[in-house]
Regions:
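Internal hydrophobic alpha-helix adjacent to the cofactor/substrate pocket in enzyme cavities
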Residues: 380-401
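A glycine-rich dinucleotide-binding beta-alpha-beta segment and adjacent secondary-structure elements
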Residues: 308-374, 402-415, 534-588, 593
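Glycine-/small-residue-rich beta->alpha transition segments that form the dinucleotide
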Residues: 151, 156-160, 316, 329
C-alpha cells in the first residue's frame, strides 16, 4: 500500500560517482537532499577498473576538486599506486592516474554521505517518477513509499534497464551482480524522455596467488607522487606494484575461432559500445595484423587477492574466456574469480538537456553520468557535481553555474554532450578541447576555485590558501624576471648536462627557463636566493614561462569564443518563423535549443551561413 514518507528539495536517484557529487553539492549548498541507491554497501562502486584519473580524466578530477567536489580527496585517501602519465609530452596532456582500493573507497564515500548535513541516504529502488500539479516531483520506491522533491537528478549509471551478456547467457542485472532498475525506464518513457541502449563491459578478475609473476614486467608508481586534491597536504604513498603482460597468436586464434559465440558479433547486443574502450575480441578483429596487445594486471585492494586484467574486457562465453586467458604469459594457471561480461543499459539522448544538465522541456529534472551517454567514473562525477550545484541554485533562486569550453574540461564535456550529442558512450580526451594548453590540470584551481568559492562550496580557509598560493606564483614570476645569473663554469655545466647550447654571457633567469631543455630544478645550484616553494607553485611558474606565447594565443581565442557566447538566444524563439535559415538548421536548432550563438555554431548540421543569418536576426530582436 502506498504511503507518503517525506519531502525534500532535491532527490538524487543513484549513488554512483555522479550521484555522490550531486547529492553532496546540493546538501552542502544548504538544500534538503536525499540520495537513493539500490545497494547501500556499494556506494561509489568501481565495477570496472579500480582506478581514478588517467589521460584527460585526471584533469576532470582536479577540476571537480577545484570546484569543491569530493572525488579527488577520496582518491588521495585510498590510493594504492600513483603515476603521472604522458610526462614525455607537453604539460597540457600530463594526467594523474591512481590505482584505488575499491572497497575502501566505496566505504569511505558512504561514510562521507552519512556524515553530511542536509543529506539523507536511503537504500531503495525508485520505480516511478511523475510531476505533481504544484510543479514538484514525486518518486515512488519499490516498497511503495512516496517522496516529494522540487528537483530530481537521475544518476542511474548502468543499472537502468541493465542486462548482462556472457556468450549465449543473458539476464537482467546491474553491475557486479546487483539488482537492475527495470521499472524506472517505463516511467521515463511516459515523460517522453528519449532513451536509447548503450553497452559497456568489464574484464575478468583473477586470484593473485594463481598468477606467475616471475616473467612479468613490473610497473612501479612514481618516486615523487602528487595528490589529486589541492587540499591534500601529504602526497599519497605507493603501496602496490602493477604488472604488464601481452597476448599472443594463440590468444588471437582462440578469439577468432569463437567469434560466432560472441553476443556482440551475433547481434544479440543491440547497444552501442564505447569507441575508445573496445572489448578484447573487438580489438582482435579491428587489428588483425597486430601480433600482441599490452595488458595490465592491477590489484583491486589491500585486503583482497582479486586482480583486475585491464585490456581484457569481453562478453565471450566463460569457457572461451578461460581458454584465452590461459594462453597469456603469467596467467597460464590463473584462477578466474569473476567472469568478464558486457552490460547493456538505457540512457538518454543528452541533446534533450541544457548546459545546467536540466531537461530542456521538463523543468526540475536533471541528468548526470552514464545516464547522459558518457562513460567513465570521472566524467560521471563531473556531471553529478554540475547537476547538483544547479539544482540547488535554482531552488535557492540564484543564477545557474554554466561552465564554458574555454574555462574547463567539465565545460567541454557538457557542451559536447548537450550540443553535439553522442552515438556511443562519450569519453573525455584532451584532444576534445581547443584550449588544452590553458586547461591544464596544474591550474585547475586558478580557473575554477573562485567559482566554487562564489557558489559556496569552497570554504573561506581554503580560499585564503588559494589566494596565498597565487601570491607566491606572482612573486616568484617577478623574482625570476629580475634575477640575473652570471656566466660561471657551474652554469655552463648545467647547459651541457641539459643538452642546450652554451652561453656567451650571463642573463636573466627567465631567459634560461624559456629554453625547452632547462627546468626550474636544474637551475637550483646557481639560483642562490631561491625561496623554498611548494612544487605546485614553481611548476605553474615554469609552465607559464615556457609556453607564454602559446598560452596568450589560446587566451585570445577564448576571448573571441566568449564574445560569441555572450549573444544569448531567447528560450522561446520560434526557428520555423525565421527567414534565412535552412530547414536542417531549423530542425536542429529547434531540437537542441542552444542558449547562445556560440553553442548554435557547434551543432552538427548548422553551417556558418546559418549562424550569420541567426546573428542578424538576434540583433533585431
Amino acid at each position: 500500500m502506498e504511503y507518503f514518507a517525506e519531502s525534500y528539495d532535491v532527490i538524487v536517484i543513484g549513488a554512483g560517482h555522479a550521484g555522490i557529487e550531486a547529492c553532496l553539492a546540493a546538501a552542502r549548498l544548504g538544500v534538503k537532499t536525499a540520495v537513493f541507491t539500490i545497494n547501500l554497501d556499494w556506494v561509489g562502486n568501481m565495477p570496472c577498473n579500480p582506478s581514478i584519473g588517467g589521460t584527460s580524466k585526471g584533469h576532470l578530477v582536479r577540476e571537480i576538486d577545484a570546484l569543491g567536489g569530493e572525488m579527488g580527496k577520496a582518491a588521495d585517501k585510498y590510493t594504492l599506486q600513483s603515476r603521472m602519465l604522458n610526462l614525455g609530452k607537453g604539460p597540457a596532456v600530463h594526467s594523474l592516474r591512481a590505482q584505488i582500493d575499491r572497497r575502501e573507497y566505496s566505504q569511505g564515500m558512504k561514510h562521507t554521505l552519512e556524515l553530511q548535513e542536509n543529506l539523507d541516504i536511503r537504500q531503495g529502488e525508485i520505480v516511478d517518477l511523475y510531476r505533481l500539479e504544484n510543479g514538484e516531483w514525486q518518486v515512488k520506491t519499490k516498497l511503495e513509499a512516496l517522496f516529494n522533491a522540487k528537483a530530481v537528478i537521475i544518476a542511474t549509471g548502468t543499472f537502468l534497464g541493465g542486462r548482462v551478456y556472457i556468450g549465449d547467457v543473458s539476464y537482467e542485472s546491474g553491475p557486479d551482480g546487483m539488482f537492475p532498475a527495470t521499472e524506472l525506464s517505463k516511467a521515463l518513457k511516459k515523460l517522453n524522455i528519449p532513451l536509447r541502449r548503450f553497452k559497456t563491459g568489464t574484464p575478468s578478475r583473477v586470484n593473485r596467488k594463481s598468477i606467475d609473476f616471475s616473467n612479468l614486467e613490473e610497473q612501479d608508481g612514481d618516486e615523487e607522487t602528487v595528490p589529486f586534491s589541492f587540499e591534500t597536504q601529504t602526497p599519497p604513498k605507493n603501496k602496490v606494484c602493477c604488472h604488464i603482460t601481452y597476448s599472443n597468436e594463440k590468444t588471437k586464434q582462440i578469439i577468432l575461432e569463437n567469434l560466432d559465440r560472441s553476443p556482440m558479433y551475433s547481434g544479440k547486443i543491440e547497444g552501442k559500445g564505447p569507441r575508445y574502450c573496445p572489448s578484447f575480441e573487438d580489438k582482435i578483429v579491428r587489428f588483425k595484423d597486430k601480433e600482441r596487445h599490452q595488458l595490465f594486471i592491477e590489484p583491486c585492494g589491500l585486503e583482497t587477492e582479486e586482480m583486475y586484467l585491464q585490456g581484457l574486457s569481453s562478453s565471450l562465453p566463460e569457457d572461451v574466456q578461460l581458454a584465452f586467458i590461459h594462453t597469456i604469459p603469467g596467467l597460464e594457471h590463473a584462477q578466474v574469480m569473476r567472469t568478464a561480461y558486457a552490460i547493456e543499459y538505457d540512457c538518454v539522448d543528452p541533446t534533450a538537456l541544457n548546459a545546467t544538465l536540466e531537461f530542456n522541456s521538463i523543468k526540475g529534472l536533471y541528468g548526470a553520468g552514464q545516464f547522459n551517454g558518457s562513460s567513465g567514473y570521472e566524467e560521471a562525477a563531473a556531471q553529478g557535481l554540475v547537476a547538483g550545484i544547479n539544482a540547488a541554485l535554482k531552488i535557492k533562486g540564484e543564477e545557474p553555474m554554466i561552465l564554458d569550453r574555454g574555462g574547463s574540461y567539465i565545460g567541454t564535456l557538457i557542451d559536447d554532450l548537450v550540443t553535439k550529442g553522442c552515438t556511443d558512450p562519450y569519453r573525455m580526451m584532451t584532444s576534445r578541447s581547443e584550449y588544452r594548453l590553458v586547461l591544464r590540470q596544474d591550474n585547475a584551481d586558478v580557473r575554477l576555485t573562485p567559482i566554487g568559492y562564489k557558489i559556496g562550496l569552497i570554504s573561506q580557509e581554503r580560499y585564503d590558501k588559494f589566494i596565498s598560493k597565487e601570491e607566491m606564483v606572482k612573486a616568484e614570476r617577478e623574482r625570476i624576471e629580475q634575477k640575473s645569473i652570471p656566466l660561471t663554469d657551474a652554469l655552463q655545466k648545467i647547459m651541457e648536462d641539459c643538452g642546450t647550447t652554451p652561453l656567451e654571457r650571463g642573463c636573466k633567469m627567465i631567459e634560461l627557463l624559456k629554453r625547452p631543455q632547462i627546468t626550474y630544478k636544474a637551475l637550483t645550484s646557481v639560483d642562490d636566493d631561491r625561496p623554498d616553494l611548494p612544487r605546485a607553485v614553481f611548476e605553474q611558474v615554469e609552465i607559464a614561462v615556457k609556453y607564454e606565447g602559446y598560452i596568450k594565443r589560446q587566451e585570445q581565442q577564448i576571448k573571441e569564443m566568449r564574445r560569441i557566447e555572450c549573444k544569448k538566444i531567447p528560450a522561446d524563439i520560434d526557428y520555423y518563423s525565421l527567414k534565412g535559415l535552412r530547414l536542417e538548421a531549423v530542425e536542429k536548432l529547434s531540437k537542441i535549443k542552444p542558449e547562445n550563438l556560440g553553442q548554435a555554431s557547434r551543432i552538427s548540421g548548422v553551417n556558418p551561413a546559418d549562424i550569420a543569418a541567426l546573428n542578424i536576426i538576434l540583433e533585431t530582436l
